[in-house]
């Protein structure tokens, strides 16, 4: 792996949605779906969905900061999910679907906190941002069938109804960040 890469860990609802969007961002080398922010070691999808672990569904984004900035990644994050709803994204309800930024260093923490302050001041949403900003303790990779889920299952009903609109929104509003033009 490129030693100049940095890592971002984000939670904003179902990890399939975030992974599908971040896979399309230039400067992103890989995206992995997983779990973070909880108290159980090596959680399973079933345990996370039952709400027994404290973990959120997250993605880890490995990116080249010379191509795309951490702030740009966060701008996309705030645009493609609702950061004002506690423990919920659409029909997905539970702490595993919370909005969270798990920072890897103090610089990421500052960028996240400053951006949240800026976005709240702009009154973009009717309610304040509830996104948790916390240090990353551990990241646990999700099961293989969750990796690249949207790319492998674009016609699955959830993907068509929930993931595809987020990908379309990203393509429409962040054209300058696209790796390539959509077909």
Task: Give, region by region, the residue ranges found by the protein language model.
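Flexible coil/turn and secondary-structure edge motifs
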Residues: 1-183
